[in-house]
Every structure is written in C-alpha cells, then in structure tokens.
Amino acid sequence: MQCPHCQHTDSRVLESRSSENGQSIRRRRECLQCKYRFTTYERIEFVPITVIKKDGKRESFDRCKLLRGIVRACEKTGIPPSRLEAIVNDIESRLQQDSKREVTSQEIGQLVLEYLRQESEVAYVRFASVYGNFQGIRDFIAALALLQSSEIERAHPSWSQVEEASVITSS
C-alpha cells in the first residue's frame, strides 16, 4: 500500500478489524520509510448485473425494485418482512455467483417464483400474474393447475414413476 505522506510502497499492518457490519475491513498501517500512520478500508466490489427486459432494453439490477415486487405479491400473506429480505438476498447472491453479467427479467422472475412457491400459494399466483402478464381467467387457471400438479408431485413423488412405468409398458 502506498504511503499518502511519502509515496513509499511498503507499509506494515498494525491492526485489522471488521467494520460496517462485516462489509469491510479497516486496517491501520505504518509506512516503513517515514513511519507515518494511516488507515485503509478494504471492501467487496460487486460486479454490476445488467437485466435484459422483455422489450430488449437493458438496465442495472435494482434490488429495491425486486423487493417491492415481492412485497406487493406477499401483502396480507403473513410472511414476515425479514423473510422477504432474505429471499431477495438469496436471489441477489445467486445472480452474483453466476458468471453471467447479463440476466433476463424472465430468469429473475423464475427465481422469484421458485422461492414464492415454497412460501405461499397466494403470493406465487399474484407474482406469476404480473410476471406472466396474465390476460384473463384462463391464465390464472393454468397457473393454479401447475401449482396443484407440483404439490401432488411433492406429496406423492412415486406417482410420477408409476405414470412413467405405465407409459413405458404400454409402448
């Protein structure tokens, strides 16, 4: 680290501690040449994620916008705000861990639906209706049928194996 006083490039760390709720590390340093003491901060640098909208426009990932959409879908469902915040944290973390720097709004919508399916059927259908741009009752019925079939699959995973076996034997 370069000394701000004499520009010498060697320094030693006297003290390190976590700061800003664990989001950075504060280091107290001393220049090896002039003995000047100074403080540096080390922070995580997140690579920005670009969201490709349905119309092809590109915009920066907006965590607040995602949270607003999820909160809206979960109104009056009893899901605590801390859980909604955790869902957004998980989604953002998954996006940051992916090597892609561009993601479609459809991919983000699918991630949200994965989480909401586990939390609340009502929130799932509400979010799906906006995300899927539902036009009428048939769209709602299709979403409910999909939700119901996945519930049956989760409750009775062997049923799909029985169905597969009957299809295989009837061929």
Curated annotation (Swiss-Prot):
Example of a GO biological process term: negative regulation of DNA-templated transcription
The keyword Transit peptide is annotated on this UniProt entry: no
Zinc finger extent (unnamed): 3-34
Domain (ATP-cone): residue spans on this chain: 49-139
Pfam families assigned: ATP-cone, Zn_ribbon_NrdR
Origin superkingdom: Bacteria
Annotated segments matching region Disordered: 1-21
Entry keyword set: ATP-binding, DNA-binding, Metal-binding, Nucleotide-binding, Repressor, Transcription, Transcription regulation, Zinc, Zinc-finger
Cofactor: Zn(2+)
InterPro entries in UniProt: ATP-cone_dom, NrdR-like_N, RNR_NrdR-like
Stretches with biased composition (Basic and acidic residues): 7-18
UniProt GO MF annotations: ATP binding; DNA binding; zinc ion binding
TM region(s), chain numbering: none
The keyword Transmembrane is annotated on this UniProt entry: no
Cofactor note: Binds 1 zinc ion.
Function of the protein: Negatively regulates transcription of bacterial ribonucleotide reductase nrd genes and operons by binding to NrdR-boxes.
Family indicated by similarity: Belongs to the NrdR family.
Record's protein name: Transcriptional repressor NrdR
Originating species: Microcystis aeruginosa (strain NIES-843 / IAM M-2473)
